[in-house]
């Protein structure tokens, strides 16, 4: 630890001696807080990295061909089919969830702030309601007249997306609400309306660009949940979704599930990076303009 020598300042009137002496305390070198932050970072890194490393070592235990599990997984058409199906369902879920959550959170914050606790309580309901209860309720209600959806593939897909939208409410609403809290939504709205913009234009051209980071955060969480979800997809997916496929593979194969987990982990992160890149690439200055 390095120290800085103390300095002494003499204060007085010329010819009358020194009136006061001020001594500055020695300053410490490296901050203890910075060292503690690095320790926490290293512990967190090992906490997330070591399980991945252990999974990788387990996946290459196939002898003599250590990458046999990866070749078998990549050669299975059900792997890419299930992953693509879950990814598409996840993207649709994100779009529908944003279309519901963003206007709701914006209107509550702008017009009816007293309803905010009620909306927060409603968005937390998926944490209380188990997915198996939700899926059996959907099947029971929509398997009989007047609205039969479980009898067709399209109807089952619609129910699946609706269930995932409900599951995404806690994560998406928290992300959007945090983004709205970071901007002055009222001033932006008044400025846009003073230039002749309607509510739809304000939300699409003013609010959305200013909470882009929050929207991407909620989208990432939603996509990760949809791709790995098992219970609802097992009952409603018209084809083998990725979650049920991974569960079925784990019952019959010892090493392939580890390979699937690592491959899907990498592909999911690649998809998230692409989405983030698209969001940053399309970033533009907010234009507050009325109709001409």
Which residues make up each language-model segment?
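Membrane-water interface segments at the C-terminal ends of transmembrane alpha-helices
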Residues: 32-63, 75-181, 206, 210, ...
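Short glycine/proline-centered loop/turn elements that form peptide/ligand docking sites
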Residues: 184-188
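Transmembrane alpha-helical segments of polytopic membrane transport and secretion proteins
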Residues: 1-40, 116, 274-292
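Glycine/proline-centered hinge or cleavage motifs at structural transition points of membrane proteins
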Residues: 195-196, 209
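Alpha-helical transmembrane segments of bacterial inner-membrane membrane proteins
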Residues: 17-22, 26, 59, 64-76
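Short hydrophobic, aromatic-rich alpha-helical segments embedded in or entering the lipid bilayer
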Residues: 64-75, 237-250
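The alpha-helix within a helix-turn-helix
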Residues: 192
């Amino acid at each position: 630890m390095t120290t800085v020598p103390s300095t002494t300042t003499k204060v007085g009137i010329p010819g009358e001696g020194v009136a006061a002496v001020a001594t500055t305390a020695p300053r410490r070198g490296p901050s203890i807080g910075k060292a503690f932050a690095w320790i926490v970072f290293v512990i967190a890194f090992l906490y997330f990295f070591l399980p991945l490393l252990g999974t990788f070592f387990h996946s290459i235990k196939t002898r003599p061909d250590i990458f046999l599990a990866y070749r078998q997984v990549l050669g299975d058409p059900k792997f890419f089919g299930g992953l693509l199906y879950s990814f598409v369902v996840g993207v649709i879920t994100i779009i529908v969830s944003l279309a519901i959550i963003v206007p709701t959170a914006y209107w509550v914050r702008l017009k009816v702030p007293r309803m905010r606790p009620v909306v927060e309580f409603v968005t937390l309901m998926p944490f209380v309601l188990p997915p198996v209860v939700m899926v059996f309720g959907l099947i029971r209600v929509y398997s009989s007249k007047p609205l039969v959806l479980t009898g067709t593939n399209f109807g089952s897909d619609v129910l699946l997306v609706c269930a995932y939208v409900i599951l995404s409410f806690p994560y998406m609403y928290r992300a959007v609400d945090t983004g709205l809290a970071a901007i002055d939504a009222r001033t932006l709205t008044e400025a846009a309306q003073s230039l002749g913009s309607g509510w739809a234009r304000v939300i699409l051209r003013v609010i959305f660009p200013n909470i882009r980071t929050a929207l991407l955060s909620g989208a990432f969480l939603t996509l990760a949940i949809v791709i790995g979800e098992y219970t609802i997809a097992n009952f409603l997916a018209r084809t083998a979704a990725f979650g049920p496929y991974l569960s079925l593979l784990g019952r019959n194969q010892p090493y392939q599930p580890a390979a699937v987990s690592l491959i899907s982990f990498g592909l999911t992160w690649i998809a998230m990076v692409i989405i983030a890149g698209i969001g940053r690439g399309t970033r533009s200055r907010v234009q507050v303009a009325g109709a001409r």
